[in-house]
């Protein structure tokens, strides 16, 4: 897990996103323990409450779960859950915006496909 904080997104959200990325890349696998609040807060010199807030986002979404007295673990099926969540966000954030801009510029679907094929 690697974190390089930016000012435009709250740190607790960046922590949650970094853990999500690590799950998607299978750095953290399902039913595996993730670094503790203390480990992350010490390593990145941030408040443990901020780390806990990021963890709580993921617990609420069912991505990770807590084993009392042991630590936080990646939930079964979390990779698929995150893939679906990210695909939906990608569609809303990028595809819809692309289609709206293409419509304004009178770019056909065929032209969009040609542009994409040229870049891939």
Predicted segments — roles?
Residues 1-33, 39, 89-119:
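Extreme N-terminal segment that seeds HTH/winged-HTH DNA-binding domains in transcriptional regulators
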Residues 8-9, 26-27, 42, 69-72, ...:
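Short hydrophobic/aromatic-rich motifs at helix boundaries and adjacent loops
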Residues 12, 16, 36, 72-87:
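Short, cationic-aromatic polyanion-contact patches
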Residues 58, 119-120:
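The DNA-recognition helices of helix-turn-helix-type DNA-binding domains
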Residues 27-28, 32, 60-69, 73-76:
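Beta-hairpin "wing" of winged helix-turn-helix
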Residues 33-65:
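N-terminal helix-turn-helix
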Residues 54, 67-69, 88, 110:
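Hydrophobic alpha-helical segments, especially transmembrane helices
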């Amino acid at each position: 897990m690697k974190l390089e904080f930016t000012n435009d997104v709250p740190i607790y959200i960046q922590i949650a996103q970094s853990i999500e990325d690590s799950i998607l890349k299978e750095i953290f696998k399902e039913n595996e323990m993730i670094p503790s609040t203390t480990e992350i807060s010490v390593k990145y010199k941030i408040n443990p409450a901020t780390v806990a807030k990021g963890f709580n986002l993921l617990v609420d979404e069912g991505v990770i779960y807590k084993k009392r007295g042991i630590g936080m673990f990646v939930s079964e099926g979390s990779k698929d859950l995150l893939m679906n969540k990210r695909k939906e966000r990608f569609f809303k954030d990028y595809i819809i915006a692309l289609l709206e801009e293409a419509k304004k510029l009178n770019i056909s679907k065929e032209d969009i496909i040609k542009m994409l094929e040229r870049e891939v």
